[in-house]
Amino acid sequence: MRYTRGAVWAGLAAVALAGTAGCGAQTTRAGEAVGRAGAIMAALGRATDRTDSLGSAEVRMSTELKGAAPIAMEGTYSWGDGYAYDVEMDTKAAKMETLTRSPSIRTLLVDGAYYYDTDPQPSGPLKGKEWMKVDASAVFGDKGAQALTGTSGAGSPAAIMRGLRYASDVRDLGRQTVDGKRATHYRAVIDKNHLGRAKEALASGDDTLFGSVTGGADSITMDVWVGAGDLPVRLKEVIGTMTVTMDFEKFGATADVKAPPAAQTGDVTELMKKAAARQ
């Protein structure tokens, strides 16, 4: 299964890394941030509270990795009771044609594990299986995965918004139109030393998929466009050599996301770890 590392990472990158800044950011910086830019932080605080309270959203997403074509995804995100998602992504862009003949591949995140709706394979751990499973530890390493999955909602859009409260160099870039909606554009930089437990993920070495693909990151640059009703219209994160952009189509009232039946699932976590270690 030499294809597994590159194929799975392309899909994971779009969502596994989005929002790492939001997990456990150190709250001791809140007072400093408000003192520096009270009006901006108040606006972001309102947007955070609104996003957090709604608990889910329908989204469209694009991930760009250096030297690769953008990967488009769309579906539902949920963060009301832990972080989960159910999305469809372009099979060809994600380089997963060897795993499914479908032009799009359904991808789930449930309880810190990623599931891909693949075609049953003739041999190996996916023989006769409908789903491929990859644990977050294969992406971020064991410590990084614990940091990201140990907090309710870690990695979700609401967590991203919370991280903005503790950023340095927060700027109001004015009113713009994005995705056909009028919104105020804010930009912030969060240093990894102010990410709390999430810095374990950013500290991942080259022996993890995160480190080998993004080159690691000392900070995250985040842009958010806040529109009507104090809700985000778009979020954008730059993490190392990766850029993730998320557009919100509708908030609230999405279906629960559940893991596939264990009998239909093949776990390739250890294969992914070994492949990353060989890079």
List the model feature ranges, each with a label.
Residues 1-21:
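Sec-dependent bacterial lipoprotein signal peptides
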Residues 2-6, 23-279:
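Subset-of-secretome marker
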